[in-house]
């Protein structure tokens, strides 16, 4: 098992690899009760009004207890994020987009408690962002002739959350709205006006310094 995990991690790009390791470590620590599972649950009020900032960090890596289901979820997520990370020419832009998504998510959680951890929500939004940018190249073909966009699957899951689990619109919007905002800033505005609004602060500063 250890050898399999090490081999899988070796094929994952740096940022996604660090996140995957963090998820595995936190999952193990909570299962062993070294970290209290109750203290990894994110709450805007507890973090920003009570000063329990550890919950914010824990929630980014929280994928549940150490079991086969959480392991599969972590490595499926790592596979998606590896594809996205490898599509960026600059790793710092990938990191900056993750930060922007996190800021938007945290702002949304100030209005309503999220249904999932910040790590799960970040993954959902990054997948949405990838589907919006490269969706036409990722179509799934059924019966050898019918092309189906993979974006239909998030729509289905969001519908299940609303009609079956009775989640609020804002809870559901946390799964895709931050990703849509970043996609609009990065792709649509960039194509129309030729401005890259998602450049990292380092790139903005470097461009202003360049004569």
Curated annotation (Swiss-Prot):
Broad class of the protein's primary localization: endoplasmic reticulum
One Pfam family in the UniProt entry: DER1
Stretches assigned to coiled coil: none
Modification N-acetylmethionine occurs at: 1
GO cellular component, one term: Hrd1p ubiquitin ligase complex
Superkingdom: Eukaryota
Record field: transmembrane: 15-32, 68-85, 93-109, 118-133, 150-165, 169-189
InterPro entries referenced in this protein's UniProt entry, alphabetically: DER1
Induction context: Up-regulated by the unfolded protein response (UPR).
Membrane topology: Multi-pass membrane protein
UniProt entry keywords in alphabetical sequence: Acetylation, Endoplasmic reticulum, Membrane, Protein transport, Transmembrane, Transmembrane helix, Transport
Summary of subunit composition and partner proteins: Component of the HRD1 ubiquitin ligase complex which contains the E3 ligase HRD1, its cofactors HRD3, USA1 and DER1, substrate recruiting factor YOS9 and CDC48-binding protein UBX2. Within the complex, interacts with USA1 (via C-terminus). In ERAD-L, HRD3 and YOS9 jointly bind misfolded glycoproteins in the endoplasmic reticulum (ER) lumen. Movement of ERAD-L substrates through the ER membrane is facilitated by HRD1 and DER1 which have lateral gates facing each other and which distort the membrane region between the lateral gates, making it much thinner than a normal phospholipid bilayer.
Miscellaneous comment as given in the Swiss-Prot or TrEMBL entry: Present with 238 molecules/cell in log phase SD medium.
Function: Component of the endoplasmic reticulum-associated degradation (ERAD) pathway. Specifically required for the ERAD-L pathway which mediates the degradation of proteins with misfolded lumenal domains within the endoplasmic reticulum (ER). Facilitates retrotranslocation of misfolded proteins from the ER lumen through the ER membrane in conjunction with HRD1. Both proteins have lateral gates facing each other and distort the membrane region between the lateral gates, making it much thinner than a normal phospholipid bilayer.
Family membership noted in the UniProt record: Belongs to the derlin family.
Name of protein: Degradation in the endoplasmic reticulum protein 1
Organism for this UniProt entry: Saccharomyces cerevisiae (strain ATCC 204508 / S288c)
Organism ancestry: Eukaryota, Fungi, Dikarya, Ascomycota, Saccharomycotina
């Amino acid at each position: 098992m250890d050898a399999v995990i090490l081999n899988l991690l070796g094929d994952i790009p740096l940022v996604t690899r660090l996140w995957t390791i963090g998820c595995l470590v936190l999952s193990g620590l909570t299962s062993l009760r070294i970290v209290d599972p109750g203290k990894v649950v994110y709450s805007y009020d507890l973090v920003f009004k009570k000063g329990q900032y550890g919950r914010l960090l824990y929630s980014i890596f929280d994928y549940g207890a150490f079991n086969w289901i959480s392991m599969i979820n972590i490595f499926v997520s790592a596979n998606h994020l590896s594809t996205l990370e490898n599509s960026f020419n600059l790793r710092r832009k990938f990191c900056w987009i993750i930060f922007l998504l996190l800021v938007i998510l945290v702002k949304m959680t100030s209005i309503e408690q999220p249904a999932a951890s910040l790590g799960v929500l970040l993954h959902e939004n990054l997948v949405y962002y990838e589907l919006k940018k490269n969706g036409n190249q990722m179509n799934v073909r059924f019966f050898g002739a019918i092309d189906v966009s993979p974006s239909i699957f998030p729509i289905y899951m969001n519908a299940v959350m609303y009609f079956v689990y009775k989640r609020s619109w804002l809870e559901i919007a946390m799964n895709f709205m931050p990703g849509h905002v970043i996609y609009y800033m990065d792709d649509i505005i960039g194509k129309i006006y030729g401005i890259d609004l998602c450049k990292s602060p380092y790139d903005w500063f470097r461009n202003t310094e360049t004569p």
